[in-house]
């Protein structure tokens, strides 16, 4: 069975992420969406909130071979502990590729048994980024349904109302 890991912070999960997961599921028998923590990032949502929201969104799509998990450690460790042979990384533009390629070289030296698979973003999601969504959600008048599922938009709006009150 070909199992792939699709790691990310998912703060929040976007249609761009969902598109990449769907496309990865066409290549692999099983895809694990891994909600991970990056100590260099500051998050709007807690790790539990990011996991629960990502889980709800993926579950609502009814995909049987896609699973959600969370991990607070090095992604390569998770992959090795769970016998996962592939890590899928989305790339939107050249600067993403440059960053991901550097990661690929390091990961390959540390664990050559795990292959990194780069998937380019679909055209309509090239400029969809979680940080952009967080910036736009501050203005409650924007309809962000082309960036994020309604479930995510409702959660973020309620989160911002709580933070701003």
Curated annotation (Swiss-Prot):
> According to the UniProt entry, what is the EC number of this protein?
2.7.7.3
- Gene3D superfamilies recorded: HUPs
UniProt-recorded Gene Ontology molecular function terms:
ATP binding; pantetheine-phosphate adenylyltransferase activity
Annotated InterPro entries = Cyt_trans-like (IPR004821), PPAT (IPR001980), Rossmann-like_a/b/a_fold (IPR014729)
Q: Which parts of the sequence are marked as the site Transition state stabilizer?
A: 17
- One annotated Gene Ontology cellular component of this protein: cytoplasm
For the protein in the UniProt heading, the enzyme class is: transferase
Q: Which reaction does it catalyse?
A: (R)-4'-phosphopantetheine + ATP + H(+) = 3'-dephospho-CoA + diphosphate
Q: Which SUPFAM superfamilies match?
A: Nucleotidylyl transferase
Any one of the GO BP annotations: coenzyme A biosynthetic process
Functional description taken from the UniProt entry: Reversibly transfers an adenylyl group from ATP to 4'-phosphopantetheine, yielding dephospho-CoA (dPCoA) and pyrophosphate.
Family (UniProt): Belongs to the bacterial CoaD family.
Protein name per its UniProtKB record: Phosphopantetheine adenylyltransferase
